[in-house]
Structure formats: C-alpha cells, structure tokens
Design a protein with these regions (language model features):
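TPR-repeat structural position
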Residues: 231, 422-423
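Bacterial Sec-dependent N-terminal signal peptides
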Residues: 1-33
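Membrane-proximal, proline-rich intrinsically disordered regions
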Residues: 22-70, 557-573
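Elongated scaffold/linker segments in the mid-to-C-terminal portions of large proteins
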Residues: 46, 61-63, 86-94, 98-107, ...
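Short, surface-exposed recognition loops and adjoining beta-strand edges that mediate ligand/DNA contacts
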Residues: 66-84, 164-166, 200-220, 226-296, ...
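Conserved, well-structured interaction surfaces
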Residues: 45-53, 57-63, 84-158, 174-186, ...
Length: 573
C-alpha cells in the first residue's frame, strides 16, 4: 500500500520535540500559521484516511513482510543457510539482543503501533459529521486491526512487549514495563479484533484491495485463541470464516506466491508490493524521506532466489522439507494433475536439481547450482516463473500473504482435534488442502492401508521407509504439525511460532540432527544422481548447532533489544 503522508506524520513528532525545547515567549513570537499540528490535522475523513495509509505502509517494512523475514525462516525445521550468510546466527541460535532483525523488527513493529495509535486516539474526538456513512467506524476498525496485528507479531516474536495504547509524548509514557502475551491479548489484541470484526466489511471494492476485512479480523482472532489453547473458541471463529463462503482455495497453489492473481479468493490478509512504483529505489527502502520515495517493493526475492540468477539464496530448503515434498505423492486420479511428476505444491515451493519445467526461463539441465550440499532452492516468493533473473536493487513486486484460507482450514483442523479429539473432521479439512495440492489424501491412504497412513516426516532415505500408523487423534495431530503445516505454509512466517507453541522444537532439532549424522556417516553412497535428494559434495550441517544450543528460555522468543533496555527506565531498574 502506497506510503502516503508519512512526512506529515513525522512532522507531528518533530513539532512536539520543538515545542518541548523552546521557551513560551519564543514559541508565541514565532508561530507559523501554515504549520500542520494535531489540532489542525485530525479533522476530516480525508485526513484520517491519509493517516491510516501510513499505518498500512508499516506492513511493508522488511522485517514485517519483506526480505528480513529470511532470519525467521531459518529458525525452525524447514530451512537452513550457509555459514557465511547473516541468517546463520538465527539458524545456529546464536543471535543476541543487539543483532540485526532483533532490533529492526522491534522498532518497525512499534512504528506501526504508533501510527495505528494516532488514528485510534484522534478519531475518538473527531466530529461524526466529517465522515460519510460508516467510514468513521471502518477507519477505526482498520486501525485497531493493524494495531492488533502488530502486537500479535510483537508478542509472539519477543514473548511480550510494552503496551502502548495511546500516543506517548513524555519519557514516562514511553517507559513502560514489559507485559506478557496474556496481558497484551486481554488489553489490546482481543478487544481490538472484536471491534474490527464487528465493524469491517466482508469485502472491499477493487480500489481498496489490501484493506483489512471482517475475515482477516475473525481469522486473526481465531489464531489468538488457538495460540492461547482456547480450542473451542478458535474452532468456532474459524468455522464462521469457512461457512461464510467468502473464501476458497485457488485451483493453482502457485497463485498465492506470485505477482499474478494477487488478492485472490484464498487471500485473507495480504500486503501489497509493486515492482513498477518508484523505479530505481532500493527495495529495502520503505518510507518516503526528504531524499527519495519509498520503493513499495519487497526485498524477499533477492534473499530466497538462486545465487546464479541475481539473488543470494540465503534461505535454503532443509533436507527434511525437500524430502517431504519429494514424497508429496501425486494422486493420478486428481484432475488437477496433468502427467506431472512433482506435486503442484512442490513445483511452486522449491527447485530441486531434477525439477520439472523451466526455472528462470531455462530447463533445469541448463541451470547452474545445486552443489556444496545445496539440494534445492526456494521458489516461493521468488521471480523464477517469469523472469530470467531477479531484478537489481532488491526489488520484487510479489505480495506477501500473512493469512490465507489454507491456513484457516489447517488451524480449524487443529482446533477440533484438540477440542474434541475429532480426528475424522480434522482429516476432512486437511484433505481439502492436500486435494488442492494434487496429492494423495490421508483418507485415500487409509482406504488403501486398512485405516493407516504413512508418517511422511520420517526420512525414507535414512530410515528405509515411511512407517504406517493407524489414524487417531495423536497421529493425525503429528501429521498436521510435522507434515501438513510444514510443507503447505513453509516460508510464510508461521513455522517457528508453531514449533514454539507446540513445545516440540527440541525434539525436532534432535531428530533432524540425527538424520544429518546418518547422512554424514553414509555420505559415500549419497553421490550426485542418487534419489531422492541428489546431494552433492557435502552434507550441509543445518541442525548440529541448533540441537546443541537450543534452550526454550533463550530461544523461543527474541530478547528485548539492548537499546530498549538501556533507555526504558522500567526495564533497567
């Protein structure tokens, strides 16, 4: 969303600082009748709409929806990196309170919170007559949704945060104590989302694509309850979204990760980026300044795209993810398939050395890469499907989807499983996602195997086969946690939060490290050309340090940035 009027909002802060630094006489002598102040700005619907656009623009920050998410992608079980890349500190769990991204995300989320707070606070005293129809309530509802979204990200990245529900103007108001996730939920997130749910439309017209909707607020509220293990409330909200028939799965899963067919029927909350606006500006630049306009672009593709095609591949699919996608078995009876060997889900997610079709407009056999233990590259969020190389200056116009319908279906399956052990219903909703991917459903596996299905997260390369397990609440939950959410939603910002809330990070790291040890020991047999992973030259050690270093108290959440600790009197006393 275009970053408009950010300079106006920054003037408010500047004016406040100037006022506190001048004597009363000087201030009275040097009034500027043309100056924009809170008393003159926060009046009309147009002014509030402009300020709301600035709050939306905070979604484009690279740590929120763009290239800096690479650091979070490598935290869990779906990805690794190389030792010379910056994400390695997150892969090895050696990050600290002063490192990039830990500080960037904190700062950028609070910028978003500040901008939303401005709209929420000042609209309370705005005259109703200045607004048309329901626009006043809709503007407040959008701002409250955004504030809730930013606080959800803050709470589940840092384990809590400082609650700012008003625009701070004094040192005392800036220095707040650290509040828990529960406190943030009850004080900010849940009330804001309930208000948003009750006051937002189901859909907007084409001119307003990207604005928060009833479905976004309801889905995020359900997610809040899911994370809080309030299973019944979560299930009820997800089912309301499902039954609304506003959303559906796209026929082609790749429509969710490319610049074509954006804001489609599967999209519930999506952040808009553009390649064409502000050409020449680096994609990492978000806000307008006195020197240049914000890029409106994402730097994500430069991070995840392949090194030989103008990117850096700082995020690499883990062998575990690669192997699960290899065995994401195509259902030849599903009409979505057309003699393809790879599942639609695999083809839109990763690029193995033996991939199908074209990759950056050339056959895989002509492309370079896949050496030094790099068995696959990330396709999702990159421009592999329509360009010969990633654009210069970190620019990509691919939107980022924070909430999509497939996620809601899987969260609903989890909620009913945990609430009532109803694994039959859970399987039905998991299979909706699997069917769209064109792969064999759990139900079909069960029909063919006497009520059992394979544990696809267990490495067939390492352990010889996928064990068959009878369907029951626990085995279906394990499949949902280790397989379905991992491969359907990988590189979308959910995985580490999932592993943390389930409490299985240590178990997963230990298992995947053991698989690495086996591959190291048996490396002489894992030569180029051998299925399923075609690993060349070495085994990449993604999980040796993670398994060794992981501590829930140290790594489940990022530390409070050192700068906040040093300046916040309520933290350093």
């Amino acid at each position: 969303m275009k970053s408009i009027n950010n300079n106006i909002l920054n003037l408010f802060l500047l004016a406040a600082l100037v006022f506190t630094g001048c004597s009363e006489a000087t201030f009275l002598d040097e009034q500027n009748p043309n100056a924009i102040t809170p008393d003159t700005f926060w009046k009309t619907e147009k002014q509030f709409t402009s300020a709301l656009s600035a709050a939306y623009s905070a979604l484009q920050f690279q740590s929120v929806s763009g290239g800096e998410l690479q650091y979070e992608f490598v935290l869990g079980d779906i990805a690794g990196t190389e030792s010379w890349y910056r994400p390695n500190a997150f892969r090895n769990l050696t990050f600290n309170d002063g490192i990039y991204h830990v500080t960037d995300k904190w700062n950028e989320l609070y910028i978003g919170i500040f901008r939303a707070n401005q709209v929420i606070e000042y609209i309370q005293t705005a005259e109703d007559s200045e607004f048309s129809d329901n626009s006043k309530a809709e503007i407040e509802a959008q701002a409250r949704f955004l504030r809730a979204f930013f606080y959800f990200q803050l709470a589940h990245t840092y384990g809590g945060g400082m609650i700012h529900d008003k625009v701070a103007s004094t040192d005392a108001e800036f220095s707040k104590p650290f509040s828990s996730i529960d406190d943030i939920n009850s004080t900010i997130i849940i009330p804001d989302l309930k208000f948003a749910k009750d006051n937002l439309p189901q859909t907007w017209n084409a001119k307003n694509q990207g604005r928060a909707t009833w479905g976004a607020a309801t889905s995020l509220l359900g997610k809040v309850y899911l994370y809080d293990e309030n299973w019944g409330e979560a299930a009820s909200l997800f089912k309301t979204v499902i039954d609304s028939q506003v959303y559906e799965l796209t026929r082609n899963i790749e429509d969710n990760f490319q610049h074509e067919n954006e804001f489609n029927k599967e999209s519930i909350f999506e952040v808009n980026y553009s390649f064409d606006i502000a050409p020449g500006v680096n994609g990492a630049v978000v806000d307008d300044s006195a020197f240049e306009s914000g890029a409106e672009s994402s730097a994500m593709a430069t991070a995840v795209g392949q090194l030989n095609f103008g990117a850096f591949n700082t995020v690499l699919p883990s062998y575990n993810l690669h192997e699960m996608l290899v065995y994401d078995e195509v259902d030849t009876e599903n009409p979505i398939n057309d003699d393809n060997i790879e599942s639609r889900r695999m083809n839109s997610t990763i690029a193995p050395s033996n991939g199908e079709g074209l990759y950056y407009q050339i056959p895989y056999t002509e492309a370079r890469g896949w050496g030094f233990g790099q068995s696959a590259y990330v396709k999702k969020h990159s421009n592999w499907y329509h360009l010969e190389a990633e654009p210069a200056q970190n620019r990509s116009g691919i939107n980022f989807r924070h909430i999509r319908y497939a996620d809601v279906l899987l969260m609903y399956a989890e909620a009913v499983l945990k609430d009532s052990n109803d694994y039959t219903t859970a399987i039905a909703y998991i299979d909706m996602v699997r069917s769209r991917a064109g792969v064999i459903t759990l139900q079909k596996y069960m029909d063919d195997n006497g009520g059992s299905f394979p544990q696809l997260h267990v490495s067939k390369q390492v352990h010889g086969d996928h064990p068959l397990v009878a369907a029951n609440p626990q085995t279906v939950l394990t499949h949902l946690q280790r397989v379905e959410r991992a491969i359907e939603l990988c590189f979308e910002g959910h995985r580490w939060k999932d592993l943390v809330r389930w409490g299985i990070a240590k178990e997963v790291f230990d298992e995947l490290h053991a698989d690495e040890v086996w591959r190291q020991t048996n490396f002489s047999t894992l030569v180029v050309g051998e299925a399923p992973l075609f690993i060349a030259e070495r085994i990449r050690p993604d999980f040796v340090k993670a398994a060794e270093n992981y501590s829930p108290t140290q790594h489940n959440y990022f530390p409070i940035p050192s700068g906040e600790v040093q300046t916040n009197d309520n933290l350093n006393n």
